[in-house]
From Swiss-Prot:
This is tRNA-specific 2-thiouridylase MnmA. GO terms for cellular component: cytoplasm. Catalyzes the 2-thiolation of uridine at the wobble position (U34) of tRNA, leading to the formation of s(2)U34. It catalyses: S-sulfanyl-L-cysteinyl-[protein] + uridine(34) in tRNA + AH2 + ATP = 2-thiouridine(34) in tRNA + L-cysteinyl-[protein] + A + AMP + diphosphate + H(+). It comes from Methylorubrum populi (strain ATCC BAA-705 / NCIMB 13946 / BJ001) (Methylobacterium populi).
Amino acid sequence: MNSLDLPKPPHETRVVVAMSGGVDSSVVAGLLKREGYDVVGVTLQLYDHGAATHRKGACCAGRDIHDARAVAETLGIPHYVLDYEDRFRESVIDRFAESYLSGETPIPCVECNRSVKFRDLLGMARDLGAEALATGHYVASRAQPEGGRALYRALDPARDQSYFLYATTPEQLAFLRFPLGERPKDETRALARELGLAVADKADSQDICFVPQGGYADVIAKLRPEAARPGEIVDLDGRRLGEHEGIIHYTVGQRRGLKLSVGEPLYVVRLEPETARVVVGPRAALATRRIRLTDLNWLGSRAPDGLADLPVAVRVRSTREPRPARLSWNAAEACLEVELVVPEDGVSPGQACVIYADDGPRAQVLGGGTIRRIGALQAGAAEAA
């Protein structure tokens, strides 16, 4: 087997590298080229939203396509640019806006990986005669004794991107390779300099690439003008405390920007899109123990519909470490339920709940799903649909 766990020698193995124009994917292309693989670079043009294409840290547009092409020329590999703007708008941006209108807090990166990068790009790689698609993500995949590949957290915990890749299917994992999963970020930049890549010191991309200056509400309002529907801010008992200019400006757990003159700190507990109400309460009202998941992607060896009180670890936000939990299958609702051992604050519908075999630094990813329903501890913060 070669370094990618493929049977042919590198010079007989074609690998397509998804090149975003950043340092990580550029280093992947450079490393594989140096090892003798037949490397083909592919860059997706996903959007071109004016200010977003020029801001520092944006990705997948204008300047980044130029950088990816320049790296390919430096390495002496063929490079193709594929126009996926329409697909990206339909699969990612429009869904992002609809999710916010529904009172959720979506993660467009998960949908982009699931609906665009790892579906369409993977198919394109096969059309080009490749035996693998390599990316610059910080996540690890390893061959399993029983066959197939499993997904694991990256060596560098500060860069681990497994939270955003939980929706990768077993079939996709078999074709994907993540050469940086076993490397720290500092080593990646050093390799970029060693390879003579002009992007060695380029800033890392932002999570939401199509949102200029972090103003996601402006993007949503432009796509869906009805999103700026004003409404009331109420407490847990329904008492009116103030007004707002649209629920798209709020997310569960938010404290800043409420503009309320009350004696105690208040947080957004839930959003009610039907009534356009923002419900606020004390921090204790955010404590969540039970989570119900939909759009489940399961990577574990045991079928999810047979699970009962399985000990695992879960992440309910990308910035948090995995926490102990237990999984059970709800046969009546045909969905997976998560019970957190220690209640968590700020659990929001629309976010991902990613499931790991344990809370270790190199834990296996068992799967995950979209948080659709939460069970809060506070009496006044009853289950929100």
